[in-house]
UniProtKB/Swiss-Prot annotation:
Protein name: Malate dehydrogenase 2
Designated gene of the protein: mdh2
PANTHER family: MALATE DEHYDROGENASE
InterPro entries associated with the record: L-lactate/malate_DH, Lactate/malate_DH_C, Lactate/malate_DH_N, Lactate_DH/Glyco_Ohase_4_C, Malate_DH_type2, NAD(P)-bd_dom_sf
Residue stretches spanning the membrane: none
NCBIfam families according to UniProt: MalateDH-SF1, PRK05442.1
EC number: 1.1.1.37
Enzyme class: oxidoreductase
Active-site residues annotated for this sequence: H191
Residues noted as binding NAD(+) in the record, renumbered to the chain: G12, A13, A14, G15, R16, V17, A18, N106, Q113, V130, G131, N132
């Protein structure tokens, strides 16, 4: 274990999702069993006492890969020279609040964090936005960072892996086969109830999923609706939002981004280059293949009428979200 430690910053570090995330990062689940890490925990001043408790627990685990823990409420210290930033914290949705209200509340938070990242982070920093609404939050952070012309737009991503994992699980449950055999799944769009789980190209143990599940209504209705509504179902069942599964998905997405997928498909929310008719500049869920800490959108997939409609619904929703945000941040979108 002679590698230099990777500096990883986690925001909202005193929160519940971060609590499910930090110990797995420190144990090597995200970057590998031979990669040391330096953890930087960032949260607001009122959370510092709770964050110190998290620090003590991390220390008490005696993780061999964890070389240093820094806990701070100073964003410049938190993001200086960081190589990976996991933006977990976001202003939660109040009871009865609409999604668009949450957008407005979070726009300035992610603009501020993006600006600090753009000025102070490692130029090769990979930024994964976990806090919802993550697509538009990622777009805002990306635009703020671009003002400093140091970190490429493609280094910002939104957490679409949770939707991907949910769809993988449903396909495994439906077919009675191990989830590890599910390949070539595509998930498109926004991390919201419009997200589109697309199994037209998917295989399980090499067998075509559309051939195994010969029921178009299941693909177009049951699978899509189950993935779309999964967060609501978890909230109704446990009285809390999905936390452990969100943290696990963040681990999965960053691990694949950092270490590569060896030719396999996964899903990331990335800035569109115009592929599949998605307007350039939107942060949108696409099927991707990752390698060498970079990604490419899977090219040349057929888009039938149903898929076109589902992709377009997501384009409209994300465009509408940005229209809410733009007047609040004219310095970024003017």
């Amino acid at each position: 274990m002679n590698q230099a430690p990777v500096r990883v910053t986690v925001t909202g570090a005193a929160g519940r999702v971060a609590y499910a995330l930090l110990f797995r990062i420190a144990s090597g689940d995200m970057l590998g069993a031979d990669q040391p890490v330096q953890l930087v925990l960032f949260d607001l001043p009122h959370a510092m006492k709770a964050m110190q408790g998290v620090v003590m627990e991390l220390e008490d685990c005696a993780f061999p890969l964890l070389t240093e823990i820094i806990a701070t409420d100073d964003p410049v210290l938190a993001f200086s020279d960081t190589q990976i930033a996991l933006l977990v914290s976001a202003r939660p949705r109040a009871v009865g609040a609409e999604r668009l209200e949450v957008l407005a509340d979070n726009a300035k938070i992610f603009a501020a964090q993006g600006a600090v990242i753009g000025r102070h982070a490692n130029p090769d920093c990979k930024v994964l936005v976990v806090g919802n609404p993550c697509n538009t939050n990622a777009c805002v952070a990306m635009k703020a960072a671009q003002k400093f012309s140091r970190i490429p737009a493609r280094n910002f991503a939104a957490l679409l892996r949770l939707d991907h994992n949910r769809a993988l699980a449903q396909l495994a449950l439906k077919t009675g086969r191990p989830v590890g055999g599910v390949k070539r799944l595509a998930v498109w769009g926004n991390h919201s109830p419009t997200v589109y789980a697309d199994d037209r190209f998917t295989t399980i143990d090499g067998d075509s999923v559309p051939a195994i599940i010969d029921n178009i209504a299941w693909h177009h209705d049951t699978l899509v609706r189950t993935v779309d509504k999964r967060g609501e179902a978890i909230l109704a069942a446990r009285g809390l939002y999905a936390e452990a599964s969100a943290a696990s998905a963040a681990i999965d997405q960053m691990r694949d981004w950092w270490l590569g997928t060896r030719g396999e498909w996964t899903t990331m929310g990335v800035v569109s280059d115009g592929a599949y008719g998605v307007p350039a500049g939107l942060v949108f869920g696409f099927p991707v293949i990752t390698d060498c800490r970079d990604y490419r959108i899977v090219p040349g997939l057929a888009v039938d009428a149903f898929a076109r409609g589902m992709i377009d619904v997501n384009v409209r929703e994300l465009t509408a979200e940005l229209e809410i945000v733009k007047p609040l941040l004219p310095e970024l979108f003017g």
